[in-house]
Amino acid sequence: MPLLNTITTPYAEAFLQVAESRNEVDEVVTQAKSILELWNSCPEFSDAMSSPVLEVNQKKAALEKLFSSQVTPSFLNLLKLLADRQRIGLLNSVLERLLEIYREQRNIALATITSASALNEDQQSELLKKVQSIAGTDNLEIDLKVDSELLGGFVVNVGSKVIDASIAGQVRRLGLALAKVS
């Protein structure tokens, strides 16, 4: 187990147990995804929470002000606990681990689909069917991303499987094939 998981797993497991005992698991998972999105998209927030300059009480007050009406009381307690223990800088890792454990417990496969441009509903539906057959399960969580560097097409990651149907991938494979020939 990687060192970071050694630190984050106990927090994630304990929090999931609390959420289960209060029948809040689905709500907490939705909140975890929202806070993760905020953490990853707002470096000012993550930098402030990770800063050793900001006192623990200031961090807890900021967390209370930001999230008291947005999350369950147990989620707010987790945030304050992480601040108290000087682990709030690991919030994203704790929440990512929480989501991993949640998916493992419910046998949900995570599929990341990165496309060169935004997919319309028909394209998403068609791709979902293909990804379900690749994953071997209908129980999927889809994470859609857009990366214009792919030039066209898409890349699908499901567990350890990668399907690269992007133009950038085709160009790379063509370059490798040409390098072998010469």
UniProtKB/Swiss-Prot annotation:
Among the GO molecular function terms of this UniProt record, one is: proton-transporting ATP synthase activity, rotational mechanism
Task: Spell out the InterPro entries in the cross-references.
Answer: ATP_synth_OSCP/delta_N_sf (IPR026015), ATPase_OSCP/d_CS (IPR020781), ATPase_OSCP/dsu (IPR000711)
- List cellular component terms (GO): plasma membrane-derived thylakoid membrane; proton-transporting ATP synthase complex
Q: Which keywords belong to this entry?
A: ATP synthesis, CF(1), Hydrogen ion transport, Ion transport, Membrane, Thylakoid, Transport
Where found, per UniProt? Cellular thylakoid membrane
Q: Does the keyword Transport apply?
A: yes
According to its UniProt record, where is this protein mainly located? membrane
Q: How does it sit in the membrane?
A: Peripheral membrane protein
* Subunit composition and interactions: F-type ATPases have 2 components, F(1) - the catalytic core - and F(0) - the membrane proton channel. F(1) has five subunits: alpha(3), beta(3), gamma(1), delta(1), epsilon(1). CF(0) has four main subunits: a(1), b(1), b'(1) and c(10-14). The alpha and beta chains form an alternating ring which encloses part of the gamma chain. F(1) is attached to F(0) by a central stalk formed by the gamma and epsilon chains, while a peripheral stalk is formed by the delta, b and b' chains.
Its function, per the record, reads: F(1)F(0) ATP synthase produces ATP from ADP in the presence of a proton or sodium gradient. F-type ATPases consist of two structural domains, F(1) containing the extramembraneous catalytic core and F(0) containing the membrane proton channel, linked together by a central stalk and a peripheral stalk. During catalysis, ATP synthesis in the catalytic domain of F(1) is coupled via a rotary mechanism of the central stalk subunits to proton translocation. This protein is part of the stalk that links CF(0) to CF(1). It either transmits conformational changes from CF(0) to CF(1) or is implicated in proton conduction.
Q: Which family does it belong to?
A: Belongs to the ATPase delta chain family.
> What is this protein's name?
ATP synthase subunit delta
- Species source reads Prochlorococcus marinus (strain NATL1A)
